[in-house]
Amino acid sequence: MPARRKARKRALDVLFEADLRGRPPVEVLAGYVERIEKPRPEHLGYAVGLVEGVAARLDRVDELIASYAEGWTLDRMPTVDRNLARIAVYELLYVDEIDDAVAISEAVELARQMSTDDSPRFLNGLLGRIAEYATR
């Protein structure tokens, strides 16, 4: 698995846990980082950056997801999909070195591995609309 995909997976793990437990993502992240054995994986820095970035801009990210998710509310989305969308939207808007197509395809691939059969198509459409229409 490529390093950045591993980072996205780790970020998803943290955001998923924070979402389920109703705790701040940065608090869950601190506990997660403490538990990682040394030497720490090279992709950890990118994962930490994703979680911290999503947490810092969560209101804006969630607002965009809610605006472009046709027929879905954030609360109705599967937890995995909601948090994959958060990571991808953060990358689309705030991580300049990641191409939009890469951010979208990575979210779709993780959804294919970890979520429902309909999730890849849903995320592809949602993220495609956000990439095309959202103000950056």
Swiss-Prot record:
Which is one GO molecular function term here?
RNA binding
Q: Gene3D superfamilies given for it?
A: NusB-like
Q: Which UniProt keywords apply?
A: RNA-binding, Transcription, Transcription antitermination, Transcription regulation
GO BP: DNA-templated transcription termination; transcription antitermination
SUPFAM superfamilies given for it? NusB-like
Domain of life according to the entry:
Bacteria
GO CC annotation terms, alphabetical:
cytosol
Role summary: Involved in transcription antitermination. Required for transcription of ribosomal RNA (rRNA) genes. Binds specifically to the boxA antiterminator sequence of the ribosomal RNA (rrn) operons.
Q: Which family does it belong to?
A: Belongs to the NusB family.
Q: Which NCBIfam families match?
A: nusB
Q: What is this protein called?
A: Transcription antitermination protein NusB
Q: Which organism is it from?
A: Salinispora tropica (strain ATCC BAA-916 / DSM 44818 / JCM 13857 / NBRC 105044 / CNB-440)
State the encoding gene.
nusB
